[in-house]
Amino acid sequence: MRFERNDLSGFLGKSFIYNYDQGWRYELYVKNATTIDYRVHSGIVGGRWVKDQTVHISRVGAAIYRVSWAEPTGTSVALTLNLEDYVVHGAIYFPRWIVDEPEKIACYQNDHLPLMEAYRDAGPIYPTHVIDSFATLIYMRDCGLNNEQVINCPPSELAEDYPFCLADKNLLPA
């Protein structure tokens, strides 16, 4: 094996912005070994942002990481980030109620957890809608661990040229 499976040091504290093939833009901050923050800039749930989501992180290659989680909404997500080829693969399992009314979760989830759970419990859950898609990394930066400033507002409050207006260096090649 060319890598140490338990060494997440090249991944923790990183922030990623990526565009799915459908044109949706997502942002992921790996806050620590068990927690992420994320923001959905565009797509069917554009406007959604979440802090302190508990996740499972695995290193599956020298520069390949898997992040998996289940949300209070009933959504399950599995992301594979390939930091050598600058590719993300996402598998998102949306319960039917989100597909039918995605605007219900286009908010700051942390302020609405009981409501998200009530929506989930009311359903319908099935048939689940699976989105299995590739994305291209467009921005990567090192923000350090547990930085509450990385994702601290909805996407609607970001500058028009975000993320390219950031003072942080983009770690992806030009």
Swiss-Prot record:
Pfam families: PA_decarbox. CDD domains: PAD. InterPro entries: Calycin, PA_de_COase. Keywords: Decarboxylase, Lyase. Its EC number is 4.1.1.-. One of its GO terms (molecular function) is carboxy-lyase activity. It comes from the Bacteria. Gene3D superfamilies: 2.40.128.20. Catalyzes the decarboxylation of phenolic acids. PANTHER family: PHENOLIC ACID DECARBOXYLASE PADC. Belongs to the PadC family. This is Probable phenolic acid decarboxylase. It comes from Vibrio cholerae serotype O1 (strain ATCC 39315 / El Tor Inaba N16961). The gene is padC.
